[in-house]
């Protein structure tokens, strides 16, 4: 046998691909262990008032946008995302440690959130590195990215129930230290197994920006994804309160609905990735938006647990395609700027949270929880109009 080099290369590539999948899951689980219980942590442990809890989420989103955009531009210019991801994981460990033992609201907001923003940036930087690796090795980027996104969805199927079990069964300290362990393992995996692809500095200096011909479409896609994520954030904020206070259904139904949707998102992402080249990203995003319109129309009319659970298939189509294709759409509109493109996509979710937090509170205060879904519907209809004007790539 004289084919050992080829076999070795294949094994090396498989090991790298497997490492990417594990890192995607770990970055997802680190976030899924913290986010679902944050409002309870702030209320019960930090003793923050409801308005301060809302301000904490808004402040987190704003700081996260500033940090992630700074790191994205720096990584696209100077390269070697591997070292940056390890650095972000280290700061993520420090953030989790601070949340585990500190109960001062302002320390957590300004120091904890700042450190957490670096930790959460490990995820988009990992996706950017994966895209560059796929392009360099000739791997199908769409399917590879879809598998990685599916790992994050899997983390969100497992993470929230585990977070509640750790926080309520043991303590928030145990929960945050578990998230710190996830960051540690993630950093070690990145350092040992992910490729290091340094960029050569260009001779000409200047700022990296989207190609002129794509700037309009990039801005339009930012608006589209922000509206879609914003409507989803409205749903996440409003749905549990709507289920409990207006439909008077069991509290656990909200958790079952979220878990069902997250589980259904995984095959949706993989199917969307498989058909992306054949059908086009714009067409798939339109399918997602139509699914969103049907989903929110159903939420406006549904009253029984069976129908609410059945609607999660439409929710999975909506979020599964957005989560799997939206990021790739940005990357294709911004060639050579994988970090900026991926972070720009990630920040559409953060801006969506800022919008949703304000809208949900005001609408529910003036009218009721049911009315919030009308605003989500309006946002999705606006998305459909925007999708008629964007070009395919």
From Swiss-Prot:
Residue stretches spanning the membrane: 13-33, 51-71, 82-102, 106-126, 152-172, 174-194, 219-239, 253-273, 283-303, 306-326, 344-364, 366-386
Official protein name in the record: Sugar efflux transporter B
Alphabetized PROSITE patterns for the sequence: MFS (PS50850)
GO molecular function: carbohydrate:proton symporter activity
Record GO cellular component, one term: membrane
Family classification: Belongs to the major facilitator superfamily. Set transporter family.
Intracellular or extracellular location(s): Cell inner membrane
Gene3D superfamilies: MFS general substrate transporter like domains
Membrane topology: Multi-pass membrane protein
Keywords: Cell inner membrane, Cell membrane, Membrane, Sugar transport, Transmembrane, Transmembrane helix, Transport
Any single biological process term in GO: D-glucose transmembrane transport
Organism placement in taxonomy: Bacteria, Pseudomonadati, Pseudomonadota, Gammaproteobacteria, Enterobacterales
CDD domains from the UniProt entry: MFS_Set (cd17471)
Main location: membrane
InterPro entries hit by this protein: MFS, MFS_dom, MFS_trans_sf, Sugar_efflux
């Amino acid at each position: 046998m004289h084919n050992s080099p080829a076999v070795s290369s294949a094994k090396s590539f498989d090991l790298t691909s497997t490492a990417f999948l594990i890192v995607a899951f770990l970055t997802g689980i680190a976030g899924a262990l913290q986010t679902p219980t944050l409002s309870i942590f702030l209320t019960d442990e930090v003793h923050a008032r409801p308005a301060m809890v809302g301000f904490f989420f808004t402040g987190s989103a704003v700081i996260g946008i500033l940090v992630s955009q700074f790191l994205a531009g720096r990584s696209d210019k100077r390269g070697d995302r591997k070292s940056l991801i390890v650095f972000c994981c280290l700061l993520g460990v420090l953030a989790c440690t601070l949340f585990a033992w500190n109960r001062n609201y302002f320390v957590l907001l300004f120091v904890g959130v700042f450190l957490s923003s670096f930790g959460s940036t490990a995820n988009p930087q990992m996706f950017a590195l994966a895209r560059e690796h796929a392009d360099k090795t000739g791997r199908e980027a769409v399917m590879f990215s879809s598998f990685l996104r599916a790992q994050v969805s899997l983390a969100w199927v497992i993470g929230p129930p585990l977070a509640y079990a750790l926080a309520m069964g043991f303590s928030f300290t145990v929960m945050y230290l578990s998230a710190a362990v996830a960051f540690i393992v993630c950093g070690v995996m990145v350092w040992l197994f992910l490729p290091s692809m340094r960029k050569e500095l260009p001779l000409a200096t200047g700022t990296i920006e989207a190609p002129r011909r794509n700037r309009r479409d990039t801005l339009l896609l930012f608006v589209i994804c922000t509206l879609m994520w914003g409507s989803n954030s409205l749903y996440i904020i409003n749905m549990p309160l709507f289920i409990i206070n207006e439909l008077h259904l069991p509290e656990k139904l909200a958790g079952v609905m979220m878990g069902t949707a997250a589980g259904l998102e995984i095959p949706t992402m993989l199917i969307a990735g498989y058909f992306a080249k054949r059908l086009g990203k714009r067409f798939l995003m339109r399918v997602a938006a139509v699914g969103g319109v049907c989903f929110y129309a159903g939420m406006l009319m549904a009253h029984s647990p069976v129908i609410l659970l059945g609607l999660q298939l439409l929710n999975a189509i909506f979020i599964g395609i957005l989560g799997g294709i939206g990021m790739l759409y940005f990357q294709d509109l911004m060639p050579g700027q994988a970090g900026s493109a991926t972070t720009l996509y990630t920040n559409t979710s953060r801006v969506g949270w800022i919008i949703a937090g304000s809208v949900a509170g005001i609408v529910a205060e003036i009218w009721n929880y049911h009315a919030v879904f009308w605003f989500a519907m309006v946002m999705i209809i606006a998305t459909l109009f925007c999708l008629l004007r964007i070009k395919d790539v």
